[in-house]
UniProtKB/Swiss-Prot annotation:
SUPFAM superfamilies referenced in this protein's UniProt entry, alphabetically: Translation initiation factor IF3, C-terminal domain (SSF55200), Translation initiation factor IF3, N-terminal domain (SSF54364)
A GO term from the CC aspect: cytosol
Main function: IF-3 binds to the 30S ribosomal subunit and shifts the equilibrium between 70S ribosomes and their 50S and 30S subunits in favor of the free subunits, thus enhancing the availability of 30S subunits on which protein synthesis initiation begins.
Any one GO molecular-function label of the UniProt entry: ribosome binding
GO biological process, one term: ribosome disassembly
Record's subcellular location: Cytoplasm
InterPro entries linked to this entry: T_IF-3_C_sf, T_IF-3_N_sf, Translation_initiation_fac3_CS, Translation_initiation_fac_3, Translation_initiation_fac_3_C, Translation_initiation_fac_3_N
Protein name: Translation initiation factor IF-3
Keyword Protein biosynthesis: yes
Database matches in PANTHER family: TRANSLATION INITIATION FACTOR IF-3, TRANSLATION INITIATION FACTOR IF-3, MITOCHONDRIAL
Protein encoded by which gene: infC
Record text on subunit structure and interactions: Monomer.
Pfam families: IF3_C (PF00707), IF3_N (PF05198)
Length: 180
């Protein structure tokens, strides 16, 4: 259906004529207290200043209202929330797969990758996979995991260390150490 009624989204704060209280505790443009005044008087002061009257805390007795530019207030609020989102880092779990017979050169390459993941603040999941007859030599797998753990002890904390084999693999999870 074209041209249907648009549902108006509810604002988090009541402004101007939406305020229901008879009297309000008023705060000025610069944050100064102007005392308890009637709603009509508060609306007049806001209109004089050419800005809006915004209800900040409706549950207070009397409700606290502030004289401010509501559009600018919303802009600043969204800008600060975007800044906070930028600063948050999503921790990912990166996986590296080893085998009991992983050669020295491959081991060093995989170790460098693990170091990079941990320095970036991500967790690292080390999966040690057994094939065929390798299942008979589980102690070799444990030696590989212990070697990784010892090589990364300055950078990482072991979150989970395998005590037994799960299926045909052992899994160890490392988390980066907190920076002081």
């Amino acid at each position: 259906m074209k041209g249907g009624k648009r549902v108006q989204t509810a604002r988090p704060n009541r402004i101007n004529s939406e305020i229901r209280a008879q009297e309000v505790r008023l705060t000025g443009l610069e944050g100064e207290q102007l005392g308890i005044v009637s709603l009509r008087e508060a609306l007049e002061k806001a209109e004089e200043a050419g800005v809006d009257l915004v209800e900040i805390s409706p549950n207070a007795e009397p409700p606290v209202c502030r004289i401010m530019d509501y559009g600018k207030f919303l802009y600043e609020k969204s800008k600060s929330s975007k800044e906070q989102k930028k600063k948050q880092k999503v921790i990912q779990v990166k996986e590296i797969k080893f085998r009991p017979g992983t050669d020295e050169g491959d081991y060093q390459v995989k170790l460098r990758s693990l170091i990079r993941f941990l320095e970036e603040g991500d967790k690292a999941k080390i999966t040690l996979r057994f094939r065929g007859r390798e299942m008979a030599h589980q102690q070799i797998g444990m030696e590989v995991l212990n070697r990784v753990k010892n090589d990364l002890q300055e950078l990482a904390v072991v979150e989970s260390f395998p005590t037994k084999i799960e299926g045909r693999q052992m899994i160890m999870v490392l988390a980066p150490k907190k920076k002081q």
